[in-house]
């Protein structure tokens, strides 16, 4: 009986060692593409008027369940007074403005993310949520820079040991009412940080590559 238990213990030890043969990587770099849509006075539908979107992405892994992500993206937003139900006390108006943003986010994976060969119990496909802070530059007559607060969710897929495919959707809330070039079109003043302000959302599909292998003897992760 003791011999059998010893054999089982040895086998479990071997499996544990094999499960951690691949290194963990700290950094991801990649690029993505998708669509961006404006939501404000001249568009009340998040899925209407979508325009092309491109981005560069970087991600620093704190541990298999948490990461800090950097996103630099750009795209156009469009809108007009045509084909909307609300009446506006201005003449026909339309706009096409360029947005360029940079933001940092905290990401939380619902399960440990990986191939399962570098961290026991890690999964190749995991959902995640994200929240962050950034800056957005918008073109137009009232061009300028405003704060954006991205809140989103997505799915990560470990396609290969060092290749990742990430699909995400995030809403960017801003305190500005000039992304569309017009403010207070009804002339009614309102209070509140995000009340009657413009915002935009982006759906993004990105591919990234893992870099910077973690020291195998280091055990200073924060879990």
Model regions and ranges:
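Gram-negative (and chloroplast) outer-membrane scaffold detector with strong preference
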Residues: 66-141, 209
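Residues that define the transmembrane beta-barrel architecture of outer-membrane proteins
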Residues: 25, 48-52, 98-102, 125, ...
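Outer-membrane beta-barrel translocator domains and adjoining extracellular loop/strand segments
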Residues: 42-46, 81-87, 117-120, 141-145, ...
């Amino acid at each position: 009986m003791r011999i059998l238990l010893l054999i089982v213990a040895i086998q479990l030890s071997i499996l544990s060692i094999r499960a951690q043969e691949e290194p963990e990587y700290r950094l991801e770099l990649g690029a993505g593409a998708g669509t961006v849509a404006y939501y404000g006075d001249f568009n009340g539908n998040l899925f209407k008027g979508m325009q092309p979107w491109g981005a560069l992405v970087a991600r620093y892994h704190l541990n298999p369940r948490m990461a800090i992500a950097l996103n630099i993206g750009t795209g156009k937003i469009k809108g007009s007074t045509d084909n909307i139900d609300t009446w506006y006390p201005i003449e026909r108006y339309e706009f096409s403005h360029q947005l360029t943003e940079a933001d940092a986010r905290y990401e939380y994976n619902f399960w440990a993310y990986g191939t399962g060969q570098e961290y026991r119990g890690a999964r190749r496909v995991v959902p995640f949520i994200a929240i962050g802070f950034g800056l957005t530059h918008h073109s137009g007559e009232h061009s300028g820079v405003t704060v954006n607060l991205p809140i989103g969710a997505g799915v990560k897929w470990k396609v290969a040991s060092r290749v990742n495919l990430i699909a995400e959707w995030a809403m960017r809330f801003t305190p500005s009412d000039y992304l569309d070039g017009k403010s207070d079109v009804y002339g009614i003043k309102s209070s509140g940080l995000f009340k009657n302000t413009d915002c935009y959302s982006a759906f993004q599909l990105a591919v990234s590559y893992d870099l910077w292998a973690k020291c195998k003897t280091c055990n200073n992760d924060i879990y």
